[in-house]
């Protein structure tokens, strides 16, 4: 109840209107009239949408006035330093002393709640890209993701995305970065950080990949406050715990639903959804390295979720570079329960 009480108390303080009573469990629709907010111990707490949105509106005022801090660090990995990152800043001295090379494509990778730049997802995705050749892989470390309170981390998403955009703009304006060579890849809350980065870049980044974009405290009906398909020239979403920790409705221009997008094989009961949620990062790293996730085109996302898209594989591979030029729609992705997870007909 900790999160609910905090939200309710703050909402009372900022609103002249009385709050509605907490909805009965039978009336709750996650993402529609409220959210189950994840807790650090893996449990979740229900918060009515009106309560949460009043609190977020008040908190946005504090964020906008600079009354909160949003520390963000950037670590560059290249084929010359594939395992030990170089911390870079938006200064010519810093970039000049690093191995950044504008002639090579650039990939930004952004972690989610409770994580840091040392998280295994960053290592896996970094290694996958560097296994393919010369890339600038920049891992974003945003400290407020490590708040024990999920809502506090959510409120840092916009400001963090703007700081990522500032780094992109600096590299473009001063060090020859070509936006057509830029991918921004984010998991969970990091997917929405990627969206805000795209919204605030001077020009359009080529691709954003949202790895199971977080659902709690984000509304499908407010695309300007979440990752959406207009945030880059091409946006791809890989949705693995839809309707729980991640969105179920399609987020990207290309929306991919491994195993139907709700739960993943090999995760067991997965009562919290954490295993399925994390599989999006594992699948993506494997897709980058092996290009082995075949997909089946669906008429709509409901068909992808129900796995009723037929059995004919398309020419589209989940996570492939070519998707930006040929993909528009929803895809069902068959997967194995163990690595290699990808399946090709």
Label for each model-derived stretch:
Residues 156-157, 193:
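Non-catalytic cap/lid and distal C-terminal segments of serine-dependent acyl enzymes
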Residues 209-217, 239-243, 261:
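Active-site nucleophile loop of the alpha/beta-hydrolase fold
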Residues 110-112, 187, 212:
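The conserved beta1-alpha1 loop
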Residues 2-130, 134-139, 146-152, 156, ...:
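Flexible, membrane-associating and regulatory peripheral segments of lipid-active enzymes
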Residues 185-196:
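Glycine-rich nucleophile elbow surrounding the catalytic serine of serine-hydrolase chemistry
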Residues 217-229:
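Flexible "cap/lid" loop of the alpha/beta hydrolase fold
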Residues 199-205:
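Conserved hydrolase catalytic core segment
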């Amino acid at each position: 109840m900790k999160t609910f009480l905090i939200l309710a108390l703050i909402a009372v303080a900022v609103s002249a209107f009385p709050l509605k009573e907490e909805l009965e469990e039978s009336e709750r629709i996650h993402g529609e009239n409220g959210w189950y907010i994840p807790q650090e111990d893996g449990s979740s707490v229900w918060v009515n949408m009106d309560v949460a949105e009043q609190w977020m509106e008040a908190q946005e005022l504090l964020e906008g006035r600079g009354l909160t801090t949003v520390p963000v660090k950037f670590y560059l990995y290249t084929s010359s330093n594939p395992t030990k990152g170089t911390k870079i800043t938006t200064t010519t001295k810093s970039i000049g002393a690093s191995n950044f090379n504008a002639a090579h494509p650039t990939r930004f990778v952004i972690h989610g709640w409770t994580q840091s730049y040392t998280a295994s997802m960053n290592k896996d995705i970094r290694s996958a890209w560097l296994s393919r050749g010369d890339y600038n892989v920049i891992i974003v470390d945003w400290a407020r993701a490590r708040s024990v309170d999920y809502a506090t981390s959510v409120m840092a998403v916009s400001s963090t995305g703007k700081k990522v955009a500032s780094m992109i703009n600096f590299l473009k304006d001063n060090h020859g970065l070509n936006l057509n060579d830029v991918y921004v890849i984010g998991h969970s809350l990091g997917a929405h950080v990627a969206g805000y980065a795209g919204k605030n870049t001077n020009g359009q980044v080529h691709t954003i990949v949202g790895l199971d974009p977080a659902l709690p405290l984000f509304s499908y009906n407010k695309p300007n406050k979440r990752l959406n398909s207009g945030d880059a020239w091409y946006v791809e979403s890989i949705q693995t715990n839809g309707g729980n920790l991640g969105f179920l409705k399609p987020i990207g221009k290309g929306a991919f639903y491994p195993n139907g997008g709700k739960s993943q094989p090999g995760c067991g009961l997965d009562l919290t959804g954490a295993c399925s949620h994390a599989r999006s990062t594992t699948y993506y790293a494997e897709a980058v390295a092996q290009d082995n996730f075949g997909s089946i085109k669906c008429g709509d996302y409901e068909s992808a979720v129900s796995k009723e898209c037929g059995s004919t594989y398309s020419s589209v591979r989940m996570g492939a570079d070519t998707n930006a030029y040929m993909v528009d729609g929803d895809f069902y992705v068959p997967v194995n329960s163990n690595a290699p997870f990808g399946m090709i007909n």
